[in-house]
Amino acid sequence: MFKKSSQLFSLVFFTIFSIFIGTASAIDLDEATRTVVVDSSGKTIVLTPEQVKRGKRLFNATCGACHVGGVTKTNPNVGLDPEALSLATPRRDNIAGLVDFLKNPTTYDGLESIAEVHPSIKSADIYPRMRSVTDEDLTAMAGHILLQPKIVTEKWGGGKIYY
């Protein structure tokens, strides 16, 4: 009886806690936070609240299993934090760079294709979740990746010390 009561209490507490203390929703983010770099020229765009919500949902469903908290499970040395993205070749710290990677992934130095081992549009036959992903979806997912350092700060891509 005690076990059932404690589980019920935990469930109720978690629900109430998540309602009041939950993560920032797209509507809560101001325009400055939703502003991301589009390409290597430095041009910026402001993501709509819908793009932010969609990007989070798609990232969690498609990428979240291997990139929890911006860390790469298969290679913890290369994360999705701003520094790692900016040091990649070509740079992945903008929407165009991330969309390009999601279409045709390459190694960190950009020399070899990794489409057979990393989900992408190019390897949609191997990774079914990528089959129905559109360019708008890719833009939303890239926007989510670029927004996270602004929302969760250094925790995004920070690794084991935070998660």
Swiss-Prot record:
The keyword Iron applies. Keywords: Chloroplast, Electron transport, Heme, Iron, Membrane, Metal-binding, Photosynthesis, Photosystem II, Plastid, Signal, Thylakoid, Transport. It comes from the Eukaryota. Its cofactor is heme c. Its main location: plastid. SUPFAM superfamilies: Cytochrome c (SSF46626). Disulfide bonds: none annotated. Heme c binds at residues 63, 66-67, 130. One of its GO terms (biological process) is photosynthesis, light reaction. It is found in: Plastid, Chloroplast thylakoid membrane. It is a peripheral membrane protein. GO terms for molecular function: electron transfer activity; heme binding; iron ion binding. Transmembrane segments: none annotated. Binds 1 heme c group covalently per subunit. InterPro entries: Cyt_c-like_dom (IPR009056), Cyt_c-like_dom_sf (IPR036909), Cytochrom_C550 (IPR029490), PsbV_cyt_c550 (IPR017851), PsbV_cyt_c550-like (IPR016003). The keyword Iron applies. It holds the Pfam family Cytochrom_C550. GO terms for cellular component: chloroplast thylakoid membrane; photosystem II. One of the extrinsic, lumenal subunits of photosystem II (PSII). PSII is a light-driven water plastoquinone oxidoreductase, using light energy to abstract electrons from H(2)O, generating a proton gradient subsequently used for ATP formation. The extrinsic proteins stabilize the structure of photosystem II oxygen-evolving complex (OEC), the ion environment of oxygen evolution and protect the OEC against heat-induced inactivation. Belongs to the cytochrome c family. PsbV subfamily. PSII is composed of 1 copy each of membrane proteins PsbA, PsbB, PsbC, PsbD, PsbE, PsbF, PsbH, PsbI, PsbJ, PsbK, PsbL, PsbM, PsbT, PsbY, PsbZ, Psb30/Ycf12, at least 3 peripheral proteins of the oxygen-evolving complex and a large number of cofactors. It forms dimeric complexes. This is Photosystem II extrinsic protein V. It comes from Phaeodactylum tricornutum (strain CCAP 1055/1). The gene is psbV.
